């Protein structure tokens, strides 16, 4: 994975890992989250729950797929960024059609605007050769049973070290460490 052990948390699957971030990071009413209509339904449902409960705003990217034009794909996301955008979720590979998204380019653009990047890597971890930190994302969730061949019920969450202290666990477990 290319990251430090303290940046990794084991989960039951990608959905649980990603929902730990979706429900565990602080967002305020009016803050915007950019995501795509092609994202996995569980993740969309989790974001919609936060929208309904807390008044965050979901900004939808609708890309025409498949596409071999990475610049087009990046532009669809970056055009959705505003000064209120706090998070962008990018699905590394859209499972419906196998479209691999240019995560690093989207993340680089987001970082220039101080936007956190959450990557759904359920269909790329151990399928393609890459290191999570090379994606320049803050959070990455995956299921280990797919391409890694680990037992069903194993998932992984990567949280960039400096983001750990501001990410609450999905399930409480006593006092939270400062880092």
Where do the language-model regions lie?
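Pyridoxal 5′-phosphate
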Residues: 1-179
